[in-house]
Amino acid sequence: MADIDNKEQSELDQDLEDVEEVEEEETGEETKIKARQLTVQMMQNPQILAALQERLDGLVDTPTGYIESLPKVVKRRVNALKNLQVKCAQIEAKFYEEVHDLERKYAVLYQPLFDKRFEIINAIYEPTEEECEWKPDEEDEVSEELKEKAKIEDEKKDEEKEDPKGIPEFWLTVFKNDLLSDMVQEHDEPILKHLKDIKVKFSDAGQPMSFILEFHFEPNEYFTNEVLTKTYRMRSEPDDSDPFSFDGPEIMGCTGCQIDWKKGKNVTLKTIKKKQKHKGRGTVRTVTKTVSKTSFFNFFAPPEVPENGDLDDDXEAILAADFEIGHFLRERIIPRSVLYFTGEAIEDDDDDYDEEGEEADEEGEEEGDEENDPDYDPKKDQNPAECKQQ
């Protein structure tokens, strides 16, 4: 028994010696290593662990435990800072209201350009040679001889086939080239070939913030509407119950429109036949039932929000996606439609993701090189005294 006590005393003396060594003035790698040793020894000490656990128990379920422990006079000052933050949110809300006013102002300046785009797409206006001149990127430039040869070949091809009017299937191609392609089903495509234009209209000055998406169609065999609309209601003010969550204007709700489908042309519905067997008599009958069908045109019939504002999970997910699509159409598709028609906008988006991927790959390669290095010691990269500040 005495031998065991002597052994424990010897180990304790050794631990104390190690601690004293760490306290000596040292520099470089030895200091880091011994600091880690000291940390390990402290975490193995039952008394230290007990004190730490007691401290943590006092903070259970209280993410702001430090705040709660502050003196009352300091808490009062923190409350003053919160009131300042609310005023900041109110100023920010005014800022976004003025941004909306600027959008309305500049929409008037954009409109003549969008009108001419509409006329070119729909063969109302034929652009001049000067308007059709486009200087390609440097990497796409070719010699004048090749240009002339290509021009002659194009002219021959044009002579061989009927001259198309405007830019056929412009908006359908825009949708098929983008993430909206998931919304467009095969049975939607013949209808979207008749889509002539998409416009965005902002609410008038002094009116509640909102915008309307207008889809203009030429006469077709599917419905009688000339224009289908989707209205989005917005809010740009902090919520009184949660003012710190304000992060700019948000879409609060949306309203679609009724589509006046011609008989048998409603692509949002389908008829299914079910066979039902009578339990008692064993007879079988066929029942016809109309059910909803996946279609782009369901976009104009969003879920209705009850007066109490409660929606089931499916309806909430649909509305959240709907808001994203409405915002995307307004901010990207309508102002930059030609780039989505050609696919250049998609390439730009892909380039952004590729750059991120390349950076990640490079980081991965560097990590791999270190791990394959026989002299690499991962412990040397660890420094418990450092942490990242966000």
From Swiss-Prot:
It comes from the Eukaryota. The modification Phosphothreonine is found at T62, T64. Polyglycylated by TTLL10 on glutamate residues, resulting in polyglycine chains on the gamma-carboxyl group. Both polyglutamylation and polyglycylation modifications can coexist on the same protein on adjacent residues, and lowering polyglycylation levels increases polyglutamylation, and reciprocally. Polyglutamylated by TTLL4 on glutamate residues, resulting in polyglutamate chains on the gamma-carboxyl group. Both polyglutamylation and polyglycylation modifications can coexist on the same protein on adjacent residues, and lowering polyglycylation levels increases polyglutamylation, and reciprocally. Its main location: nucleus. A motif (NAP1L motif) lies at residues 125-150. A lipid is attached at C387 (S-farnesyl cysteine). The modification 5-glutamyl polyglycine is found at E358, E359. InterPro entries: NAP-like_sf (IPR037231), NAP_family (IPR002164). GO terms for molecular function: chromatin binding; histone binding; histone chaperone activity; kinase binding. It is found in: Nucleus; Melanosome; Cytoplasm. The modification Cysteine methyl ester is found at C387. The modification N6-acetyllysine is found at K116. The keyword Amino-acid biosynthesis does not apply. Residues 11-28, 131-143, 345-375 have a biased composition (Acidic residues). The NAP1L motif is required for the histone chaperone activity. Belongs to the nucleosome assembly protein (NAP) family. Histone chaperone that plays a role in the nuclear import of H2A-H2B and nucleosome assembly. Also participates in several important DNA repair mechanisms: greatly enhances ERCC6-mediated chromatin remodeling which is essential for transcription-coupled nucleotide excision DNA repair. Also stimulates homologous recombination (HR) by RAD51 and RAD54 which is essential in mitotic DNA double strand break (DSB) repair. Plays a key role in the regulation of embryonic neurogenesis. Promotes the proliferation of neural progenitors and inhibits neuronal differentiation during cortical development. This is Nucleosome assembly protein 1-like 1. The gene is Nap1l1.
